[in-house]
């Protein structure tokens, strides 16, 4: 009997709660979701407010029977019995209310997600179509009573947050997959800017990603308007343009020589101070310029990277190759201003004395003196050829060169001036006439040196400029500033003092 009375009380309370919820939804135009009644007293009070002429229980019963159909009343009675038996609500929700399963229990689920007192009173709606904040759970967390404490419902909150994170991660993965499968071509994945491998640029590239690698065409983006030569930096282009304009803003305070670049002036000042900071690791020689040290190291390594295209001659320096090409071209760009005598090399002009016949040029170049291998001077070869031709003309009337390879010690004795002797000399000179002048070059040629390779690590060299202390003495020498023998710079202080004394 007591059980049936309790069931009736629960049924009436539930009916009153449903009536109160419906009445409040009508007043709020279904714009917000309200929390369900916290107890039977609040539901009865709301029913009494609707029916003030009746008592509390009578008002609740009248509102319940007036608002619900018989089927809904039976379902409410069964639900009250399920509460008493402590059965899960989810097992009865779909069968009792097939038209709207969350009509009764969704409000209680909203009550579970309410924050503690002192915070917001209502939960935000789950969707714009339903006034209920959250649908009923899947049954993993059964509810024993509508007045359960918030600690029992914290797992539900965590589950809700996790589900939101999973949905967010799913959306991100879908957006990444869509980006990789676009029809515009293969696109590299977005990079943080630290990987050098992210260098691809697709047709539909990422607008938000910053390019990591440089465009190869932009490595030398500064181009000279005169010679179309490209440079990687603006100040390098400005220094290069001075070679076209002839501007030399840097002046030496000692000899007032001007330069196009500041580091050329610094190197030139070492000639006045006598500083030679570059030391050879294989010998005790010191140099003013790093280019001179690099060129000197090729003497130890035996490297000759510059080859003549005409005679296959090899040289260790580009300036030596340029000077050698003057021999084939027959050019003598260095001219004396007084006697107008021309020379192929600058140091020949500097050592020239006007009014005095120049001595025969030695076979060894000053740049290579004391070093191995020996470079043969073309001027010495011509002078030797002329001397031997004069000897042949004196004794036999021949102008051809002497065959030095066939010479014997007997030839050093006194000449027989008799008729037989004269005929023998004539016959000997006639045989010499068949020889070519090239045979004499074979006498002075030495075999290539067998020197092991010596490694060397040197910095890069800039384009050459005349850094010596003397000024050019002729126009031809001024035009050949790039052909200057840079070995003379190391001996420039001594030569400068010598010219000052003369």
Swiss-Prot record:
List each coiled-coil range.
none
Q: What is this protein called?
A: Protein krueppel
Which keywords accompany this UniProt record? Answer: Developmental protein, DNA-binding, Gap protein, Metal-binding, Nucleus, Phosphoprotein, Repeat, Zinc, Zinc-finger
Q: Main subcellular localization, coarse class? A: nucleus
Question: Where do the record's region annotations for Disordered lie?
Answer: 115-164, 178-202, 399-427, 445-502
Q: Which GO terms describe its cellular component?
A: nucleus
Is DNA repair among this UniProt entry's keywords? no
Q: Give me the stretches of Acidic residues compositional bias.
A: 410-419, 482-491
Keyword Nucleotide-binding set for record: no
**Annotated PROSITE patterns:** ZINC_FINGER_C2H2_1, ZINC_FINGER_C2H2_2
Q: Which family does it belong to?
A: Belongs to the krueppel C2H2-type zinc-finger protein family.
Quote the InterPro entries the UniProt record gives: Zinc_finger, Znf_C2H2_sf, Znf_C2H2_type
Q: Where are the zinc fingers (C2H2-type)?
A: 222-244, 250-272, 278-300, 306-328, 334-354
**Its GO biological process terms?**
axon guidance; compound eye development; heterochromatin formation; Malpighian tubule bud morphogenesis; muscle organ development; negative regulation of DNA-templated transcription; negative regulation of transcription by RNA polymerase II; neuroblast fate determination
Q: Where in the cell is it found?
A: Nucleus
Q: GO MF annotations for this entry?
A: DNA-binding transcription factor activity; DNA-binding transcription factor activity, RNA polymerase II-specific; RNA polymerase II cis-regulatory region sequence-specific DNA binding; sequence-specific DNA binding; zinc ion binding
Q: Which residues carry this modification: Phosphoserine?
A: 468, 471, 477
Function, as annotated, reads: Krueppel is a gap class segmentation protein. It is involved in the segmentation of the embryo and in the differentiation of the Malpighian tubules.
């Amino acid at each position: 009997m007591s059980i049936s009375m309790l069931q009736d009380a629960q049924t009436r309370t539930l009916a009153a709660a449903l009536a109160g919820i419906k009445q409040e939804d009508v007043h709020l135009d279904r714009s917000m979701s309200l929390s369900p009644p916290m107890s039977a007293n609040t539901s009865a009070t709301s029913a009494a407010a609707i029916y003030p002429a009746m008592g509390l229980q009578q008002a609740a019963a009248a509102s319940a029977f007036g608002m619900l159909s018989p089927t809904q009343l039976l379902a409410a009675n069964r639900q009250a019995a399920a509460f008493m038996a402590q059965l899960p609500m989810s097992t009865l929700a779909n069968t009792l209310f097939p038209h709207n399963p969350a009509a009764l229990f969704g409000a209680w689920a909203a009550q579970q997600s309410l924050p503690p007192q002192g915070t917001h009173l209502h939960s935000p709606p789950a969707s714009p179509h339903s006034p209920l904040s959250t649908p009923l759970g899947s049954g993993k967390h059964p509810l024993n009573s509508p007045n359960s404490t918030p600690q029992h419902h914290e797992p539900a909150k965590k589950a809700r947050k996790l589900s939101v994170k999973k949905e967010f991660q799913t959306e991100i993965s879908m957006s990444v997959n869509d980006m990789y499968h676009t029809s515009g071509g293969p696109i590299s994945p977005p990079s943080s800017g630290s990987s050098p491998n992210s260098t691809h640029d697709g047709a539909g590239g990422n607008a938000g990603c910053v390019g990591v690698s440089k465009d190869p065409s932009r490595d030398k983006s500064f181009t000279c308007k005169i010679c179309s030569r490209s440079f990687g930096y603006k100040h390098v282009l400005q220094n290069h343009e001075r070679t076209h304009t002839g501007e030399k803003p840097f002046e030496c305070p000692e000899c007032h020589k001007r330069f196009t670049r500041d580091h050329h002036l610094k190197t030139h000042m070492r000639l006045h101070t006598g500083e030679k900071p570059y030391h050879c690791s294989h010998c005790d020689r010191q140099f003013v310029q790093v280019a001179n040290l690099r060129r000197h190291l090729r003497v130890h390594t035996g490297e000759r990277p510059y080859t003549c295209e005409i005679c296959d001659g090899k040289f260790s320096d580009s300036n030596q190759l340029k000077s050698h090409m003057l021999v084939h071209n027959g050019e003598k760009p260095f001219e004396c201003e007084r006697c107008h005598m021309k020379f192929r090399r600058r140091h020949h002009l500097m050592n020239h004395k006007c009014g005095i016949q120049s001595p025969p040029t030695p076979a060894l170049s000053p740049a290579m003196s004391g070093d191995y291998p020996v470079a043969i001077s073309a001027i010495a070869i011509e002078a030797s050829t002329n001397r031997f031709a004069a000897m042949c003309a004196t004794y036999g009337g021949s102008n051809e060169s002497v065959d030095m390879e066939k010479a014997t010690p007997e030839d050093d004795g006194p000449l027989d001036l008799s008729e037989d002797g004269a005929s023998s000399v004539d016959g000997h000179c006639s045989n010499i006439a068949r020889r070519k002048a090239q045979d004499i070059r074979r006498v002075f040629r030495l075999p290539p040196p067998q020197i092991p390779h010596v490694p060397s690590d040197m910095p890069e060299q800039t384009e050459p400029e005349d850094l010596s202390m003397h000024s050019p003495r002729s126009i031809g020498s001024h035009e050949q500033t790039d052909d200057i023998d840079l070995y003379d710079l190391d001996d420039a202080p001594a030569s400068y003092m010598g010219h000052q004394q003369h």
